[in-house]
Amino acid sequence: MKLLLAMALLQGMTAYAGEVRSNGYTARFDERIETAPGDLHGETVGGIRLVRTADQALVWQENTPLRPGCGNVAAVTAINDRYMALCGHLGGRHYTQKIIFTQGSSLSMASVDQYDSPSPVRVERNGSLAIDVLRRDLFPGELTGPHYFPTVYRLRHDDAMFGFLPSFDGDVAERYWLHYRATRQAAPAAEVLPELLASLLAAQSGKQSICAELDTLAADLQQGRQYDAQGARTLMRTWLHKLSAIGYPAFDTQACPGRI
């Protein structure tokens, strides 16, 4: 597997962004200026090409509004001898990763949006691919300011589908705990309660119990006497139900009896 990654300045109407050669294929992600009659400046867009390295035969091509590169995540990456990843953005925001399966003559592609927080694709211990996504604006009108809700997406690759699905099993629980701890340290509980509870719901399948953290959050909400004990637990219970309604696991009341 040979990785070639290059960056260049705008040359003519095209900027070369990156190229990867892996498992007999070459993937290239370019940035170019697209113009139409009457345009003064044109629009910056992207172009993706996949060719067989041996004979340079084109096997797949896509024109996309995505522009190559995602900050610290390269525009094109060879993950292993089966997968390549392409990452692009819409004018510096809303990042999207595309995963290409390149084994033998079989080619498949799956996409996952990472919104405004790009991160690399990970290879799990069992060989599957996973990626962390921080979703925002899940409760418009209820929450002000940026609130980031974590979801680990795992690539499902079988006869039924090739695509990313949310994962909340025990193998990814630690990823949710990492987000919980980082959020806990960044702001008071009352300011980030929904995303804290989302992380705890997502981590329920792990080995570590969430019960003690629920008690701590309830106590923190009572500091400054903004909430009494009943008010704090009512608020937490309300958000637990709302989070379950948008796809997070339901709260296991039997695992933490009497907490909420």
Predicted regions and their residues:
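Beta-strand C-termini and the immediately following turn/loop, strongest in propeller blades
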Residues: L86-G91, L134-R136
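Sec-dependent N-terminal signal peptides
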Residues: L3-G12
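Acidic, glycine-anchored loop motifs typical of Ca2+
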Residues: T77-A85, E124-I131
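Repeated scaffold domains used in trafficking and secretory/extracellular systems
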Residues: P68-A75, Y115-V123
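Structural motif
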Residues: E43-G47, G92-I100, P140-V152
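Surface-exposed loop/turn elements that mediate protein-protein interactions on large endomembrane-trafficking
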Residues: I48-E62, K98-D113, T151-L165
